[in-house]
């Protein structure tokens, strides 16, 4: 059985947040809850924990890939400066996490967030994720499963969406 490695991040920014209703990544694809975690390159502790977890999953799951770690394995932290033409990803790494199971969504005091407008792309918080090995349809790598998210503070909404309160505040 494949082994996974769990990580609770430091403060990240959430993007492409679909934590209340699952979305299909591709038309006709499986519905999943998902979020992109934007991690400052200055957050060495979170980056180190993620990289160690990924390396542990690779070592513990060689059998998933036929006994050795394949070259060109997919997964891991991605460089926002290199891959995204978006100021929200500047000086940051990112990783996409998803799950078929609905994640827990809580506030800074660990109270469940029920109001869907309270957790959004652009807010800041922490995430609990699990890294796992996969070998499916010729694609091999280390995936990132979404467990839970915790909102710690507000942030400017990403994607140009504003609330009525923001639009009409005097």
Task: Explain the meaning of each model-derived region.
Residues 1-94:
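OB-fold ssDNA-binding interfaces and closely related basic DNA-contact patches used
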Residues 1-6, 156-170:
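Acidic, gly/ser/pro-rich intrinsically disordered tails
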Residues 39-41, 131-133, 153:
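Beta-strand elements of well-folded, non-transmembrane domains
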Residues 96-114:
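Beta-strand/loop nucleic-acid-binding surfaces
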Residues 99, 131-133, 148-150:
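Short, flexible loop/turn elements at secondary-structure junctions
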Residues 108-125, 132-142:
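Exposed beta-sheet edge/beta-hairpin loop segments within beta-rich domains
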Residues 136-156:
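OB-fold/S1-family single-stranded nucleic acid-binding modules
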